[in-house]
């Protein structure tokens, strides 16, 4: 064995002693990342997961879980507002969007706690921050609570998910929000223009309309929910119009 090879081996040993070394490092704690980490740990690997913000991913924190909780509240509000007589309900009822929002966060946080429990149960190291590759076997944490930490690994799984795609010339901020900002707001606006009549846009429209918000949906295609069957689009458009939602199809926006 040559001196250069011996030096490389010594260097690797020193790195493992002075830094945290793992069989598997997972970038991203969404459903792809944390499930992969659990499986690797079950197979006997030493595993770490690096996550900069949302343990459990977008779905659990600011996506399908809190949105479905809000939809349930909106469904209850709709029943009182539009179907009370059919259920034998009478009297004045008020609806507090802030309470609905608080419930949605509680539901979300409860499930996220479950993700942390699974990490602990499977002896997976949690690292909070943004991971950046220093080389093919090293990641440095450049942001977050564990900023400055360096880890080395034998294998890395990249499960970083995606980011919101904005419209050309549009910057998120102020009264222009993405789904993420909106789902974290604890107050309902007086009015809202929703660009896009896909599933996310239609869900927000239903929630807000049932809490008295003046909602307008702008859609480039010729119908709402354009990826669904035409019969579905037709029926849901009819129901939304009954709610007072304005639907503008075959339309563009200019800001």
Report residues per predicted region.
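Rossmann-like NAD(P)H-binding beta-loop-alpha module
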Residues: 187-220, 227-228
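N-terminal Rossmann-like FAD-binding beta1-loop-alpha1 element of flavoenzymes
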Residues: 24-48, 204-209
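Beta1/beta-strand and adjacent pyrophosphate-binding region of the FAD-binding site
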Residues: 18-30, 190-195
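Conserved small/polar residues in nucleotide/adenosyl-binding loops
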Residues: 253-255
């Amino acid at each position: 064995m040559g001196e250069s090879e011996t030096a490389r081996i010594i260097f690797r040993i020193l790195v493992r002693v002075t830094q945290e070394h793992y069989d598997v490092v997972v970038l991203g704690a969404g459903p792809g990342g944390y499930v992969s980490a659990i499986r690797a740990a079950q197979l006997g690997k030493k595993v770490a997961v690096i996550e900069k913000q949302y343990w459990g991913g977008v779905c659990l924190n600011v996506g399908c879980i809190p949105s479905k909780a809000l939809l349930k509240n909106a469904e209850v509000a709709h029943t009182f507002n539009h179907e009370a007589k059919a259920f034998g309900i009478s009297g004045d009822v008020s609806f507090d969007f802030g309470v609905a929002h608080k419930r949605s966060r509680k539901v979300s946080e409860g499930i996220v706690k479950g993700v942390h429990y699974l990490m602990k149960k499977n002896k997976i190291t949690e690292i909070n921050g943004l991971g950046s590759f220093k080389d093919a076997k090293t990641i440095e944490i450049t942001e977050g609570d564990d900023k400055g930490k360096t880890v080395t690994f034998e294998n890395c799984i990249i499960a970083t998910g995606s980011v919101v795609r904005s419209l050309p010339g549009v910057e998120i901020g102020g009264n222009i929000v993405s789904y993420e900002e909106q789902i974290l707001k604890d107050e309902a606006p007086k009015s809202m223009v929703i660009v896009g009549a896909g599933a996310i846009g239609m869900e927000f429209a239903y929630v807000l309309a049932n809490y008295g918000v003046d909602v307008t949906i702008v859609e480039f295609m010729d119908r709402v929910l354009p990826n669904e069957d035409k019969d579905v689009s037709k029926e849901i458009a009819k129901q939304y119009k009954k709610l007072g939602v304005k639907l503008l199809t075959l339309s563009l926006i200019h800001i």
